[in-house]
Swiss-Prot record:
Domain of life: Bacteria
One GO MF term: nuclease activity
KW Protein biosynthesis (keyword) present: no
GO biological processes: rRNA 5'-end processing
Family: Belongs to the YqgF nuclease family.
Name of the protein in its database record: Putative pre-16S rRNA nuclease
Annotated Gene Ontology cellular component terms: cytosol
UniProt entry keywords in alphabetical sequence: Cytoplasm, Hydrolase, Nuclease, Ribosome biogenesis
């Protein structure tokens, strides 16, 4: 894994990024456009094991001209790292070792809340919100990262 500052230096235009929201049961996936300006929810993967996740990511990467991976880091509100942050860090490290792309961790505080509230503003019904919350949270994470990278 690399730092966001190194990622900013190394990232190139005309490639897309994947954003990941690694949950205990589901993994939200988002992808940005090639101009790296808009993050879009892509899919939700039911969590099985890290190797199957990596295989699934390799397919997405191959099919979508992906140039980097941004993983939501569940930092506690006080800035400390809890048990879920350690788990995410372990998975992100395995992804980084298995896929030859830059991988960074991005602070995901309030991403799920933000995604849920945004879908509420868009008048999406509750059952659809629940089905898509993980990929929407991944888009929220990715959008924050690409906004930072572009400024």
């Amino acid at each position: 894994m690399i730092t966001i500052e190194d990622f900013k230096i190394k990232h190139t235009n005309k490639v897309r990024f994947i954003g990941l929201d690694l949950g205990s049961k589901r993994i939200g996936v988002s992808i940005c456009d090639e101009r790296q300006s808009i993050a879009t929810p892509f899919k939700t993967i039911n969590k099985t094991n890290t190797n199957e996740l990596i295989d699934e990511l390799k397919i997405i990467i191959k099919d979508n001209n992906i140039g980097g991976i941004i993983v939501g880091n569940p930092v506690n509100m006080d800035g400390s790292l809890g048990r879920s942050a350690q788990s995410v860090n372990d998975v992100a490290s395995n992804i980084s070792k298995s896929i030859d792309l830059p991988v960074i961790l991005w602070d995901e505080r309030l991403s799920t809340v933000g995604a849920f509230n945004l879908s509420s503003l868009l008048d999406v019904n509750v059952s659809k919100r629940v089905k898509t919350i993980d990929q929407n949270a991944a888009a929220f994470i990715l959008q924050g990262a690409i906004d930072f990278l572009n400024n």
